[in-house]
Amino acid sequence: MVYDLERTKGVLWLENFVMLALTGGEGPEDSLASFLTSFIRQGQLRIVSEMSLEQLEVMRRLVPGFVEHFQIISVSEMDTPTSLRIFEYFNQYTNRTININFSQKALELSYVLLDRFVRYESFPGKAIRFLQTCANQAFLANRRHLDVPDVIGYFSQQTGIPDFLLRDDLLIDNESLHRFFLARIKGQNHVIDKICSIIKVFKAGLNDPNKPVATLLFAGPTGVGKTATAKAISEYFFGIGQKYQPLIRLDMSEFQHPGQIYRMIGSQGKLVQHVREKPFSVILLDEIEKAHPLIFDALLTVLDEGMLIDDLGRLADFRNTIIIMTSNLGGTQRSSLGFKSYQGHDFEADIRAFFKPEFYNRIDVFLIFNPLDEITIRAITLKELNEVENRDGIKQRGLKLF
Protein backbone atom coordinates (compact mmCIF):
# COMPACT_ATOMS: atom_id res chain seq x y z
CA MET A 1 0.00 0.00 0.00
CA VAL A 2 2.81 2.43 0.91
CA TYR A 3 4.57 1.88 -2.41
CA ASP A 4 1.31 2.19 -4.38
CA LEU A 5 0.55 5.51 -2.69
CA GLU A 6 4.08 6.74 -3.35
CA ARG A 7 3.91 5.69 -7.00
CA THR A 8 0.53 7.34 -7.61
CA LYS A 9 1.28 10.31 -5.32
CA GLY A 10 -1.86 9.37 -3.43
CA VAL A 11 -2.93 10.46 0.05
CA LEU A 12 -4.05 8.05 2.78
CA TRP A 13 -7.10 9.25 4.73
CA LEU A 14 -7.44 7.86 8.27
CA GLU A 15 -10.66 8.45 10.15
CA ASN A 16 -9.44 6.88 13.41
CA PHE A 17 -5.91 8.12 13.93
CA VAL A 18 -5.50 6.63 17.42
CA MET A 19 -5.95 3.11 16.05
CA LEU A 20 -2.51 3.45 14.42
CA ALA A 21 -1.04 3.23 17.91
CA LEU A 22 -3.21 0.26 18.89
CA THR A 23 -2.85 -1.87 15.75
CA GLY A 24 0.10 -4.15 15.10
CA GLY A 25 2.31 -5.58 17.84
CA GLU A 26 1.78 -6.09 21.54
CA GLY A 27 2.41 -2.44 22.43
CA PRO A 28 2.59 1.06 20.89
CA GLU A 29 6.32 0.62 20.22
CA ASP A 30 5.46 -2.27 17.85
CA SER A 31 2.36 -0.61 16.42
CA LEU A 32 1.47 0.40 12.89
CA ALA A 33 2.27 3.99 13.84
CA SER A 34 5.86 3.06 14.68
CA PHE A 35 6.15 1.03 11.46
CA LEU A 36 4.96 3.94 9.30
CA THR A 37 7.16 6.56 10.96
CA SER A 38 10.17 6.04 8.66
CA PHE A 39 7.98 6.20 5.52
CA ILE A 40 6.42 9.46 6.71
CA ARG A 41 9.77 10.96 7.66
CA GLN A 42 11.24 10.14 4.23
CA GLY A 43 8.26 11.60 2.39
CA GLN A 44 7.12 8.25 0.95
CA LEU A 45 3.73 8.39 2.65
CA ARG A 46 1.28 11.26 2.97
CA ILE A 47 -1.51 10.95 5.53
CA VAL A 48 -4.49 13.17 6.31
CA SER A 49 -6.57 12.53 9.43
CA GLU A 50 -8.73 14.23 12.02
CA MET A 51 -8.89 13.97 15.78
CA SER A 52 -9.90 15.82 18.91
CA LEU A 53 -7.38 17.59 21.13
CA GLU A 54 -7.84 14.79 23.68
CA GLN A 55 -6.99 12.15 21.08
CA LEU A 56 -3.94 14.18 20.04
CA GLU A 57 -2.64 14.01 23.60
CA VAL A 58 -3.29 10.25 23.69
CA MET A 59 -1.21 9.78 20.54
CA ARG A 60 1.61 11.85 22.00
CA ARG A 61 1.54 9.68 25.10
CA LEU A 62 1.35 6.34 23.29
CA VAL A 63 3.84 7.01 20.48
CA PRO A 64 6.11 9.91 21.47
CA GLY A 65 7.32 11.92 18.50
CA PHE A 66 4.91 10.42 15.96
CA VAL A 67 2.50 13.35 15.63
CA GLU A 68 5.41 15.77 15.30
CA HIS A 69 5.88 14.43 11.75
CA PHE A 70 2.50 15.98 10.85
CA GLN A 71 1.41 19.53 10.22
CA ILE A 72 -1.28 20.14 12.82
CA ILE A 73 -4.10 22.47 11.75
CA SER A 74 -6.58 23.62 14.39
CA VAL A 75 -10.16 23.82 13.10
CA SER A 76 -12.68 25.81 15.14
CA GLU A 77 -16.43 25.28 15.22
CA MET A 78 -18.38 27.61 12.94
CA ASP A 79 -20.19 30.52 14.54
CA THR A 80 -23.97 30.92 14.41
CA PRO A 81 -24.29 33.18 11.32
CA THR A 82 -21.93 31.01 9.27
CA SER A 83 -23.72 27.82 10.33
CA LEU A 84 -27.09 29.27 9.35
CA ARG A 85 -25.73 30.19 5.93
CA ILE A 86 -24.57 26.58 5.52
CA PHE A 87 -28.11 25.48 6.45
CA GLU A 88 -29.50 27.69 3.69
CA TYR A 89 -27.07 26.24 1.14
CA PHE A 90 -28.11 22.76 2.21
CA ASN A 91 -31.78 23.74 1.91
CA GLN A 92 -31.16 24.93 -1.64
CA TYR A 93 -29.44 21.63 -2.41
CA THR A 94 -32.32 19.47 -1.10
CA ASN A 95 -34.84 21.67 -2.88
CA ARG A 96 -32.96 21.24 -6.15
CA THR A 97 -32.21 17.51 -5.87
CA ILE A 98 -35.22 15.94 -4.13
CA ASN A 99 -37.70 18.84 -4.03
CA ILE A 100 -37.66 19.12 -0.22
CA ASN A 101 -37.81 22.60 1.29
CA PHE A 102 -37.30 23.73 4.91
CA SER A 103 -38.89 26.92 6.16
CA GLN A 104 -36.54 29.55 7.58
CA LYS A 105 -38.01 29.05 11.06
CA ALA A 106 -37.44 25.30 10.78
CA LEU A 107 -33.76 25.89 9.98
CA GLU A 108 -33.39 28.31 12.88
CA LEU A 109 -35.11 25.91 15.27
CA SER A 110 -32.80 23.10 14.14
CA TYR A 111 -29.87 25.22 15.22
CA VAL A 112 -31.46 25.98 18.62
CA LEU A 113 -32.29 22.32 19.35
CA LEU A 114 -28.91 21.00 18.28
CA ASP A 115 -27.08 23.75 20.13
CA ARG A 116 -28.87 22.89 23.37
CA PHE A 117 -29.07 19.12 23.20
CA VAL A 118 -26.35 17.84 20.85
CA ARG A 119 -23.25 19.49 22.25
CA TYR A 120 -21.09 16.39 21.84
CA GLU A 121 -20.86 17.18 18.10
CA SER A 122 -19.97 20.40 16.29
CA PHE A 123 -21.59 22.70 13.75
CA PRO A 124 -22.17 22.54 10.87
CA GLY A 125 -21.67 18.75 10.65
CA LYS A 126 -24.26 17.77 13.25
CA ALA A 127 -26.85 20.03 11.64
CA ILE A 128 -26.26 18.72 8.13
CA ARG A 129 -26.61 15.13 9.38
CA PHE A 130 -29.84 16.00 11.19
CA LEU A 131 -31.34 17.95 8.28
CA GLN A 132 -30.37 15.15 5.88
CA THR A 133 -32.22 12.65 8.07
CA CYS A 134 -35.28 14.92 8.16
CA ALA A 135 -35.19 15.35 4.38
CA ASN A 136 -34.85 11.61 3.76
CA GLN A 137 -37.79 10.77 6.03
CA ALA A 138 -39.90 13.52 4.47
CA PHE A 139 -39.08 12.23 0.99
CA LEU A 140 -40.16 8.69 1.95
CA ALA A 141 -43.39 10.11 3.42
CA ASN A 142 -44.00 12.11 0.23
CA ARG A 143 -43.64 15.40 2.14
CA ARG A 144 -42.23 18.39 0.29
CA HIS A 145 -42.28 21.25 2.81
CA LEU A 146 -40.93 21.01 6.37
CA ASP A 147 -41.83 23.52 9.06
CA VAL A 148 -41.29 23.87 12.82
CA PRO A 149 -43.61 20.99 13.91
CA ASP A 150 -41.87 18.64 11.46
CA VAL A 151 -38.39 19.43 12.78
CA ILE A 152 -39.58 19.00 16.37
CA GLY A 153 -41.22 15.70 15.45
CA TYR A 154 -38.07 14.31 13.84
CA PHE A 155 -35.90 15.53 16.72
CA SER A 156 -38.29 13.92 19.20
CA GLN A 157 -38.03 10.61 17.32
CA GLN A 158 -34.24 10.71 17.45
CA THR A 159 -33.91 11.67 21.11
CA GLY A 160 -37.08 10.27 22.68
CA ILE A 161 -37.82 13.66 24.28
CA PRO A 162 -41.57 14.44 23.99
CA ASP A 163 -42.45 17.43 21.84
CA PHE A 164 -44.10 19.39 24.67
CA LEU A 165 -40.74 19.52 26.46
CA LEU A 166 -39.17 20.98 23.30
CA ARG A 167 -41.83 23.49 22.27
CA ASP A 168 -42.12 26.86 24.01
CA ASP A 169 -45.71 27.25 22.83
CA LEU A 170 -46.88 24.14 24.69
CA LEU A 171 -47.34 24.14 28.46
CA ILE A 172 -47.04 21.12 30.71
CA ASP A 173 -50.40 19.82 31.87
CA ASN A 174 -49.72 19.40 35.59
CA GLU A 175 -52.62 16.99 36.06
CA SER A 176 -51.61 14.63 33.25
CA LEU A 177 -47.97 14.83 34.39
CA HIS A 178 -48.87 13.61 37.88
CA ARG A 179 -51.28 11.05 36.45
CA PHE A 180 -48.49 9.53 34.35
CA PHE A 181 -46.31 8.86 37.39
CA LEU A 182 -49.16 7.92 39.74
CA ALA A 183 -50.05 5.10 37.34
CA ARG A 184 -46.51 3.72 37.60
CA ILE A 185 -45.34 4.60 41.12
CA LYS A 186 -47.39 3.63 44.17
CA GLY A 187 -47.19 5.00 47.68
CA GLN A 188 -44.49 7.59 46.94
CA ASN A 189 -46.39 10.80 46.24
CA HIS A 190 -43.61 13.00 47.64
CA VAL A 191 -41.21 11.40 45.14
CA ILE A 192 -43.61 12.11 42.29
CA ASP A 193 -43.91 15.76 43.34
CA LYS A 194 -40.14 16.17 43.24
CA ILE A 195 -39.81 14.44 39.85
CA CYS A 196 -42.48 16.73 38.42
CA SER A 197 -40.52 19.74 39.68
CA ILE A 198 -37.38 18.46 37.93
CA ILE A 199 -39.33 18.07 34.68
CA LYS A 200 -40.63 21.63 34.92
CA VAL A 201 -37.11 22.97 35.48
CA PHE A 202 -35.93 21.04 32.40
CA LYS A 203 -38.88 22.31 30.35
CA ALA A 204 -37.99 25.90 31.28
CA GLY A 205 -34.34 25.32 30.32
CA LEU A 206 -33.20 26.23 33.85
CA ASN A 207 -31.13 23.11 34.53
CA ASP A 208 -27.34 23.53 34.48
CA PRO A 209 -26.38 22.89 30.82
CA ASN A 210 -22.89 21.69 31.79
CA LYS A 211 -24.03 18.88 34.07
CA PRO A 212 -26.38 15.91 33.76
CA VAL A 213 -30.04 16.93 33.61
CA ALA A 214 -30.36 15.76 37.23
CA THR A 215 -28.45 13.61 39.71
CA LEU A 216 -30.76 11.80 42.11
CA LEU A 217 -30.19 9.45 45.02
CA PHE A 218 -33.02 7.13 46.06
CA ALA A 219 -32.76 5.67 49.58
CA GLY A 220 -34.80 2.91 51.13
CA PRO A 221 -34.90 -0.89 51.37
CA THR A 222 -35.51 -3.25 48.48
CA GLY A 223 -39.02 -3.38 47.08
CA VAL A 224 -40.31 0.15 47.69
CA GLY A 225 -40.24 1.23 44.03
CA LYS A 226 -36.83 2.79 43.43
CA THR A 227 -36.15 0.89 40.20
CA ALA A 228 -39.75 1.30 39.02
CA THR A 229 -39.38 5.05 39.50
CA ALA A 230 -36.19 5.13 37.43
CA LYS A 231 -37.98 3.26 34.63
CA ALA A 232 -40.91 5.69 34.75
CA ILE A 233 -38.55 8.66 34.50
CA SER A 234 -36.77 7.16 31.49
CA GLU A 235 -40.09 6.45 29.79
CA TYR A 236 -41.35 10.00 30.31
CA PHE A 237 -38.16 11.88 29.45
CA PHE A 238 -36.68 9.81 26.65
CA GLY A 239 -39.19 7.13 25.68
CA ILE A 240 -41.03 8.66 22.71
CA GLY A 241 -40.75 6.39 19.68
CA GLN A 242 -37.95 4.32 21.21
CA LYS A 243 -37.85 0.58 20.55
CA TYR A 244 -35.88 -0.16 23.71
CA GLN A 245 -36.18 1.53 27.08
CA PRO A 246 -33.61 4.35 27.28
CA LEU A 247 -32.19 3.13 30.58
CA ILE A 248 -29.03 1.33 31.57
CA ARG A 249 -28.85 -0.38 34.96
CA LEU A 250 -25.48 -1.13 36.48
CA ASP A 251 -25.28 -3.37 39.54
CA MET A 252 -22.58 -1.59 41.49
CA SER A 253 -21.76 -4.73 43.46
CA GLU A 254 -19.98 -5.83 40.26
CA PHE A 255 -17.49 -2.98 40.66
CA GLN A 256 -16.05 -3.65 44.11
CA HIS A 257 -12.38 -3.91 43.08
CA PRO A 258 -10.08 -1.16 41.72
CA GLY A 259 -9.37 -2.99 38.45
CA GLN A 260 -13.08 -3.19 37.63
CA ILE A 261 -13.32 0.55 37.08
CA TYR A 262 -12.25 0.08 33.44
CA ARG A 263 -15.20 -2.27 32.87
CA MET A 264 -17.38 0.72 33.63
CA ILE A 265 -15.62 3.82 32.27
CA GLY A 266 -12.73 2.51 30.15
CA SER A 267 -12.75 2.61 26.34
CA GLN A 268 -14.78 -0.63 26.32
CA GLY A 269 -16.67 0.12 29.53
CA LYS A 270 -20.40 -0.56 29.74
CA LEU A 271 -21.32 2.93 30.90
CA VAL A 272 -19.19 4.80 28.37
CA GLN A 273 -20.37 2.67 25.44
CA HIS A 274 -24.03 3.08 26.44
CA VAL A 275 -23.79 6.88 26.68
CA ARG A 276 -22.06 7.11 23.31
CA GLU A 277 -24.79 5.01 21.69
CA LYS A 278 -27.70 6.53 23.66
CA PRO A 279 -26.77 9.99 24.94
CA PHE A 280 -30.42 10.63 25.89
CA SER A 281 -31.10 8.12 28.65
CA VAL A 282 -31.39 7.37 32.35
CA ILE A 283 -28.40 5.81 34.10
CA LEU A 284 -29.36 3.68 37.10
CA LEU A 285 -26.47 2.91 39.45
CA ASP A 286 -28.01 0.28 41.71
CA GLU A 287 -26.73 -0.04 45.29
CA ILE A 288 -24.10 2.62 44.74
CA GLU A 289 -22.56 2.07 48.18
CA LYS A 290 -21.22 -1.34 47.10
CA ALA A 291 -18.87 0.14 44.47
CA HIS A 292 -15.16 0.69 45.10
CA PRO A 293 -14.28 4.25 46.22
CA LEU A 294 -12.33 4.77 42.98
CA ILE A 295 -15.67 4.56 41.15
CA PHE A 296 -16.96 7.49 43.20
CA ASP A 297 -13.85 9.51 42.31
CA ALA A 298 -14.33 8.74 38.60
CA LEU A 299 -18.00 9.73 38.78
CA LEU A 300 -17.10 13.13 40.23
CA THR A 301 -16.06 14.31 36.77
CA VAL A 302 -19.38 13.15 35.32
CA LEU A 303 -21.46 14.80 38.04
CA ASP A 304 -19.45 18.02 37.96
CA GLU A 305 -18.69 18.51 34.25
CA GLY A 306 -21.18 16.22 32.53
CA MET A 307 -18.44 14.59 30.47
CA LEU A 308 -15.97 11.74 30.63
CA ILE A 309 -12.93 11.09 28.44
CA ASP A 310 -11.79 7.48 28.18
CA ASP A 311 -8.23 6.19 27.93
CA LEU A 312 -8.33 6.61 24.13
CA GLY A 313 -9.27 10.28 24.33
CA ARG A 314 -12.88 9.74 23.26
CA LEU A 315 -15.61 11.84 24.79
CA ALA A 316 -18.76 10.49 26.43
CA ASP A 317 -21.29 13.28 26.99
CA PHE A 318 -23.55 12.83 30.04
CA ARG A 319 -25.23 16.25 29.81
CA ASN A 320 -28.44 14.75 28.39
CA THR A 321 -28.62 11.94 30.92
CA ILE A 322 -30.38 11.63 34.25
CA ILE A 323 -28.22 9.82 36.79
CA ILE A 324 -30.08 7.90 39.47
CA MET A 325 -28.27 6.17 42.30
CA THR A 326 -30.03 3.83 44.70
CA SER A 327 -28.87 2.92 48.17
CA ASN A 328 -29.99 0.55 50.89
CA LEU A 329 -27.77 2.16 53.51
CA GLY A 330 -29.59 2.17 56.82
CA GLY A 331 -32.58 0.29 55.45
CA THR A 332 -31.33 -3.28 55.10
CA GLN A 333 -31.32 -4.06 58.81
CA ARG A 334 -34.76 -2.59 59.39
CA SER A 335 -36.75 -4.02 56.51
CA SER A 336 -35.57 -6.45 53.88
CA LEU A 337 -38.52 -5.87 51.58
CA GLY A 338 -39.74 -2.42 52.53
CA PHE A 339 -42.94 -3.64 54.21
CA LYS A 340 -42.08 -2.45 57.72
CA SER A 341 -41.92 1.06 59.03
CA TYR A 342 -38.60 2.84 59.42
CA GLN A 343 -40.22 6.12 60.34
CA GLY A 344 -37.88 8.48 62.14
CA HIS A 345 -34.67 6.95 60.80
CA ASP A 346 -32.28 9.49 59.27
CA PHE A 347 -31.30 7.83 55.98
CA GLU A 348 -29.69 11.02 54.77
CA ALA A 349 -27.32 10.97 57.74
CA ASP A 350 -26.26 7.41 56.81
CA ILE A 351 -25.57 8.49 53.23
CA ARG A 352 -23.74 11.63 54.29
CA ALA A 353 -21.52 9.65 56.67
CA PHE A 354 -20.70 7.07 53.98
CA PHE A 355 -19.73 9.30 51.03
CA LYS A 356 -17.04 11.95 50.83
CA PRO A 357 -18.50 15.49 51.05
CA GLU A 358 -17.35 16.34 47.50
CA PHE A 359 -19.38 13.39 46.17
CA TYR A 360 -22.45 13.89 48.35
CA ASN A 361 -22.61 17.61 47.56
CA ARG A 362 -22.93 16.89 43.83
CA ILE A 363 -26.22 15.04 44.31
CA ASP A 364 -29.08 17.35 43.28
CA VAL A 365 -31.96 15.58 44.97
CA PHE A 366 -32.04 13.08 47.84
CA LEU A 367 -35.30 11.11 48.11
CA ILE A 368 -36.31 8.69 50.86
CA PHE A 369 -38.89 6.13 49.75
CA ASN A 370 -41.76 5.38 52.10
CA PRO A 371 -42.38 1.88 53.45
CA LEU A 372 -45.30 0.16 51.76
CA ASP A 373 -48.57 -0.15 53.64
CA GLU A 374 -51.17 -2.83 52.98
CA ILE A 375 -53.24 -0.68 50.60
CA THR A 376 -50.18 0.20 48.50
CA ILE A 377 -49.02 -3.41 48.36
CA ARG A 378 -52.46 -4.45 47.15
CA ALA A 379 -52.45 -1.71 44.47
CA ILE A 380 -49.00 -2.80 43.22
CA THR A 381 -50.07 -6.45 43.14
CA LEU A 382 -53.20 -5.64 41.12
CA LYS A 383 -51.16 -3.49 38.73
CA GLU A 384 -48.65 -6.30 38.11
CA LEU A 385 -51.40 -8.90 37.68
CA ASN A 386 -53.21 -6.63 35.25
CA GLU A 387 -50.05 -6.32 33.13
CA VAL A 388 -49.63 -10.09 33.09
CA GLU A 389 -53.30 -10.58 32.22
CA ASN A 390 -52.91 -8.32 29.16
CA ARG A 391 -50.17 -10.48 27.64
CA ASP A 392 -51.11 -12.21 24.40
CA GLY A 393 -50.62 -15.70 25.82
CA ILE A 394 -53.17 -15.00 28.56
CA LYS A 395 -55.71 -13.06 26.47
CA GLN A 396 -55.73 -15.60 23.63
CA ARG A 397 -56.71 -18.32 26.08
CA GLY A 398 -59.41 -16.19 27.70
CA LEU A 399 -57.84 -16.57 31.15
CA LYS A 400 -58.59 -14.28 34.08
CA LEU A 401 -56.13 -13.89 36.95
CA PHE A 402 -58.49 -12.04 39.30
At which residue positions do the language-model features occur?
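AAA+ P-loop NTPase nucleotide-binding core of proteostasis motors
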Residues: 1-402
